[in-house]
Amino acid sequence: MKQKRNLKLMKFWRHIVYAISTACFLFFSVGGAQAGLRISDRNSNAYIGLLIPVGPAHYAAIMKKFKKIKSVRVGQFEYQIGSIYKIPVVICIQPFGGEYTRALTAQVMVDHFKIKALLYPGTSGAHIPPGKMHVGDIVIGTKQVNFANFYMSPTGKITPDEFSGKSSLRGYQYFYLNKNLEKYTACAARYVSDREELPSWINGKYKIQKPAIYYYGIQGTSTMWLADKSFIKKTDDVFHEVDEDGDWFSATVAKLAKIPFIEVSTISDSVFEFSGNGVPPRGEHRKTASQITQDISDKIILRVIKTYGYNLLNKKYSYPLRNPYPVSFYRTPTDPRGLIDACQARQRATS
């Protein structure tokens, strides 16, 4: 009898252990599956990332088209999730100024969302005198350079990057825009420029009211704000940048992530046109020059999203390993050289 009772007890506890094991297995399996679903759900939605400069605080053109779904806070940065022209986008307005800060927001964005391209509409200061460049002109970032990354010899000679003249940055010293992306941006810039009329006061005595487009722009990035024309010439002789306040740092984030980076900057000030810090005097006008020019860059990026957003989400665009254009293209950058021929018909169809 005692042996039978022991056998029954053993069977009872065996059932209990089996039930507990099964429950644990199901709990962790379902929990793991749910966690997996949550992670894959977050990563299954592809977005275009939009980097918005903190200044000028003028985002109306973009925000009017943006249909917000929700906000997501990641660390110190807040991201707005939604769509523009039915294209899924993530927007981040950097919390405070500076290229480094914007690149940090870009890195966190790329790490936490499935970003397929980074777009940056900005304003910048001219490094070329009037007659060639004016306030309101549009610069496409065909080449991105960090013109503050140099060695200066005891005699004042500038050598790019390190004093040896050999860059440790390798393929990250300069960035070149993919040729297809160049066409997309050129078409969008031309579409906006054709419909834009600058106020006569914005270019002072020059009275230029139609923005020129630097189709083959060498965009310069640094954390310097230069009003010294002799120093501008010094860096320009080496790096050939046409403007300052580009976003080489965010371009680095994009290339590391193997996604496209498109930057469009509109010239908002020029020490060659105006005295002091080169900012056009606002007078009694409703908008500042920086707000007017930020609007232009925003409209161009909106046009890129509207016309080519689906392509950016679904196609691959590699970075050119070397300069895709002859040096002569950069010497006469306002000549499109057939860049916009194929897209004019498409733009008419989608206007």
Language model features with spans:
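Glycine-rich phosphate- or other oxyanion-binding loops that anchor nucleotides, phosphorylated ligands
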Residues: 37-47, 74-348
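Bacterial N-terminal signal peptides
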Residues: 18-28
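N-terminal amphipathic/basic-hydrophobic helices that include classical n-h-c signal peptides
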Residues: 1-6, 344-345, 349-350
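Boundary at the C-terminal end of the N-terminal hydrophobic targeting segment
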Residues: 33-35
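Short polar catalytic/cofactor-binding loops
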Residues: 53-57, 223
